[in-house]
Amino acid sequence: MFFDIVKALQCSWSTRRKRRSAPCLEIIRSAGHSLIDCCPLRGSWDEMTTRETTAYMPLNDMDLSLSLGDRFMVIAYGAIQWPWLLRSLDGGRKKDKADLLAYLDLPLDALPNLGSWKADTNFLWHIVSAIEDMRPAQVVELGCGASTFVAARALQLFGGGKIVSFDQHAEFAATTQSWILDNKMDAEIRHAPLGAPPAGWPGHWYQLSDVPKEIDLLIVDGPPWAIHPHVRGAAASLFPRIRPGGRVLLDDAARPGERVVARRWRKEHENMEFTLDSQGAKGTLLGYKHSA
């Protein structure tokens, strides 16, 4: 699938400072032969969560049955948004990451390598800033990982609110939960398999249960775009739960698919204000809910 081309771009990026390995060259060669491949790459569980490194590719969601239309959209958007995918390999400057960890009073090795499918430092700073400013009682997150770790630490420092995070991969959710607990922080991470989306939205969506009735901060960092470029738009189904004055943070907001989502959100939710911060590797959409 398009993952092969993304992986080839990753190999080209990662080998700028060193000679390309034989496996890398083979990936680059094979990527040109086929756009559709039923076996996208995945990382091991240890690679996904260790502080030293994480896998570049997200876990395999392709056991889902994608419609012909969804497959076409993924291929079409993949053809135009590869520059954003390539740019996203950069998780941010090492200094920015070090500054973030120092601000949270965490050791330099507390976070894994960032970038690719993971949050970059700019998005993580937005999470910390929102929590410090709002002191939210309830944070809800879609897609767990480094962002959950940072949000849990920020809540520990600023206000002591709660975070509930949903992720489609049960084992990854459990591993992330252990990672956070091992660092003496608090977060509730739940498995939410992907299934039918809310009416009016394409792709597949989290099958959510026991969602908090009121949300102060909604963090949207999943599902991955390879399910459908507009898949994260279904997060709007949670907007009625956001309290007046509450906020939304959407990761990867500079990508073409997320820009379409943002336009629709602005049109359909007049009581909310959305602003794009294009800084960082991937961009962040900042949402604010007015009182009426």
Identify what each model region corresponds to:
Residues 17, 49-105, 110-111:
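Membrane-proximal basic amphipathic "stem/tether" segments
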Residues 104-133:
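Class I SAM-dependent methyltransferase Rossmann-like catalytic core
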Residues 162-167:
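Conserved SAM-binding motif I beta-strand of class I
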